[in-house]
Amino acid sequence: MGSKSYPTVSDEYLAAVGKAKRKLRGLIAEKNCAPLMLRLAWHSAGTFDVSSRTGGPFGTMKNPGEQSHAANAGLDIAVRLLDPIKDQLPILSYADFYQLAGVVAVEVTGGPEVPFHPGRQDKPEPPPEGRLPDATQGSDHLRQVFSAQMGLSDKDIVALSGGHTLGRCHKERSGFEGAWTSNPLIFDNSYFTELVSGEKEGLLQLPSDKALMADPAFRPLVEKYAADEDAFFADYAEAHLKLSELGFAEE
């Protein structure tokens, strides 16, 4: 990854970011929607394609066309929940706002503090469908999407997978049902402790989760994060930051 050169934003813009943060904390507490907000931020950013420099965290998820992509089922709910806050803060880009929602979602559920740099500009065109990871696939597919397409590392893949500590799968959205951990509203390393301890009645393991244990490069990272939550939090914050800034502020 090249070094970053962040744009300068006005004091008024920074004040709007602060206000958005407070309002997002309130919304997420009231609606228990941290998992949904993290998914919105991830799915917005995870469309980035290194070779064509298209897609990425640039606010296109507000477009109903992108919300209708199969991988984004249910994200129309996130957009709708966020609209009343966004309406109060017209100066903010959707791009910054959706990524800020993901950062706040991790913070308020007890996860690490992910740095946030404002200044993303909204792009008009949504990316083509089919760039997000498919949960039914294995490690080759994960590397194709995260490494070849997005430019992230093996460590980023495993750390970001740990974000599944939040939330659950819904049959009507993904075809899968259930939560990964026994407390889906707390951000901790239990995704990894569950993976290492094997399958349990009532908890979900997707094919893409099992792939982490089967892969010789991924598995040591899973075991490290299961044993050391601080190491997971440090690597997660770095990976989330990278994901949230794909295609943004690059030299």
Swiss-Prot record:
Expressed in aerial vegetative parts and reproductive organs. Expressed in roots, leaves, stems and flowers. Expressed in young leaves, internodes, blade ears, stems and anthers. SUPFAM superfamilies: Heme-dependent peroxidases. The active site is at residue 43. Keywords: Calcium, Cytoplasm, Heme, Hydrogen peroxide, Iron, Metal-binding, Oxidoreductase, Peroxidase, Potassium, Stress response. It comes from the Eukaryota. Its EC number is 1.11.1.11. InterPro entries: Ccp1-like, Haem_peroxidase, Haem_peroxidase_sf, Peroxidase_I, Peroxidases_AS, Peroxidases_heam-ligand_BS. Disruption phenotype: Semi-dwarf plants, yellow-green leaves, leaf lesion mimic phenotype, abnormal anther morphology, defects in pollen viability and seed sterility. K(+) binds at residues 165, 181, 183, 186, 188. It catalyses: L-ascorbate + H2O2 = L-dehydroascorbate + 2 H2O. GO terms for biological process: cellular response to oxidative stress; hydrogen peroxide catabolic process; response to reactive oxygen species. Inhibited by p-chloromercuriphenylsulfonic acid (CMPSA). One of its GO terms (molecular function) is peroxidase activity. Belongs to the peroxidase family. Ascorbate peroxidase subfamily. This is L-ascorbate peroxidase 2, cytosolic. It comes from Oryza sativa subsp. japonica (Rice).
